[in-house]
């Protein structure tokens, strides 16, 4: 009776080694795959973050892809000026120059008859004259009292360029476009040897029931908050302040039993708009108990505390907060680099890969 292995035993041993090797490879592959769930109330900047991932981690938008956004740029621009003109009626604001009333009538006629993806010289002229009117500007300065696209001034101030016959949207123009996200948008990219799958979920509450099957096995949640929402009402629920709506949603996500082991990254977004607004619109609109100054630093720190205090598991769960401007590529690049390091530290060190 010798100790030599039979041919069958050797084959079995080889098979066993191969299975172990495959399992190890699969384990490494799984460890390198990062699932990110982007959550937040409507218009908090989630889709802009996704666009930035394409710009930062892929080749960005090709000229052909940029051209496809032309119709959206025009639609956003036209809808913005229409929203302001309609709000003037509700807020009882008159045109500084009464001749603009004819332009307003013309705007509605031309907007209804212009082919999608085109901006005629006549329509551009009407919009330009309206935008320069003192009454229109007065109404624009009260935009917290009605729903207006954040990019309204960006496009309207640049009407000469975007209405030009040879206009092709820039990457920044594309970043500023607003199209309501419905359903789930999945984006894949590689960064720091990790394979990211990012899921952008429709922000409006009517869409939230669609999130559920995205949750399983998610590595981290990036929760976006529009800081500038503190003095707005929400489109779907005129009774609830936008910031309170975000806090309510964050509470339900942060303390959800499914996310006990999930890293929660909080993006307090639109910091640029917040910095402008806080000079003239008091934080007490949203937080009556706030007794601090209306400086950006103090007000922003207070909002951060309000969100972080919602975490009921402070002893075991850390919230990683970043102030962001989703339309600023350098800022998003810097923040996402820090976010990736947190993901590596929290989720991947155990595998011995990093």
UniProtKB/Swiss-Prot annotation:
Would you tell me the protein name for this molecule? Guanine nucleotide-binding protein G(i) subunit alpha-1
Annotated region G3 motif: the residues are: 196-205
What GO biological process terms are annotated to this protein in UniProt? adenylate cyclase-modulating G protein-coupled receptor signaling pathway; cell division; cellular response to forskolin; G protein-coupled receptor signaling pathway; positive regulation of protein localization to cell cortex; regulation of mitotic spindle organization
Q: Where in the cell is it found?
A: Nucleus; Cytoplasm; Cell membrane; Cytoplasm, Cytoskeleton, Microtubule organizing center, Centrosome
Q: How does it assemble?
A: Heterotrimeric G proteins are composed of 3 units; alpha, beta and gamma. The alpha chain contains the guanine nucleotide binding site. Part of a spindle orientation complex. Identified in complex with the beta subunit GNB1 and the gamma subunit GNG1. Identified in complex with the beta subunit GNB1 and the gamma subunit GNG2. GTP binding causes dissociation of the heterotrimer, liberating the individual subunits so that they can interact with downstream effector proteins.
Region annotated G1 motif sits at 35-48
Record GO cellular component, one term: heterotrimeric G-protein complex
Which UniProt key words apply to this protein?
Cell cycle, Cell division, Cell membrane, Cytoplasm, Cytoskeleton, GTP-binding, Hydrolase, Lipoprotein, Magnesium, Membrane, Metal-binding, Mitosis, Myristate, Nucleotide-binding, Nucleus, Palmitate, Transducer, Transport
Where does this protein come from, organism-wise?
Answer: Oryzias latipes (Japanese rice fish)
PTM characteristics: Myristoylation at Gly-2 is required for membrane anchoring before palmitoylation.
Locate the G-alpha domain: which residues? 32-354
Q: Where is this region: G2 motif?
A: 173-181
Which catalytic reaction applies to this protein?
GTP + H2O = GDP + phosphate + H(+)
């Amino acid at each position: 009776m010798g100790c030599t292995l039979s041919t069958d035993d050797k084959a079995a041993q080889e098979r066993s080694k191969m299975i172990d090797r495959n399992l190890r490879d699969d384990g490494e592959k799984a460890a390198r795959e990062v699932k990110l769930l982007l959550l937040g109330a409507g218009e908090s900047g989630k889709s802009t973050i996704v666009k930035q991932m394409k710009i930062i981690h892929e080749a960005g938008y090709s000229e052909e892809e940029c051209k496809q956004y032309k119709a959206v740029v025009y639609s956003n621009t036209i809808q913005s000026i229409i929203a302001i003109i309609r709000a003037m009626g509700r807020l009882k604001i008159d045109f500084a120059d009464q001749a603009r009333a004819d332009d307003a009538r013309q705007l509605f006629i031309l907007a209804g008859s212009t082919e999608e993806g085109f901006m005629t010289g006549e329509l551009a002229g009407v919009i330009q004259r309206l935008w320069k009117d003192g009454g229109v500007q007065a109404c624009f300065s009260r935009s917290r009292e009605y729903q207006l696209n954040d990019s309204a001034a960006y496009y309207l101030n640049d009407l000469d360029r975007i209405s030009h016959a040879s206009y092709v949207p820039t990457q920044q123009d594309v970043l500023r476009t607003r199209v309501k996200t419905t359903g789930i948008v999945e984006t894949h990219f590689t960064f720091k040897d990790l394979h990211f799958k990012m899921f952008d979920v429709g922000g409006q509450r009517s869409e939230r029931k669609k999130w559920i099957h995205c949750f399983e096995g998610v590595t981290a949640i990036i929760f976006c908050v529009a800081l500038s929402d503190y003095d707005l009402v929400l489109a779907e629920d005129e009774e609830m302040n936008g910031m309170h709506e975000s806090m309510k949603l964050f509470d339900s996500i942060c303390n959800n039993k499914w996310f006990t082991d999930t890293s929660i990254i909080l993006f307090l977004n639109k910091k640029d708009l917040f910095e402008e607004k806080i000079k003239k619109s008091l934080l007490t609109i949203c937080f009556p108990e706030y007794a601090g100054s209306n400086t950006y630093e103090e007000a922003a720190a207070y909002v951060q505390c309000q969100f972080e205090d919602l975490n009921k598991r402070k002893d075991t769960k850390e919230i990683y907060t970043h102030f962001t401007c989703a339309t600023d590529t350098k800022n998003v690049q810097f923040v996402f680099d820090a976010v990736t390091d947190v993901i590596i530290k929290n989720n991947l060190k155990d595998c011995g890969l990093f």
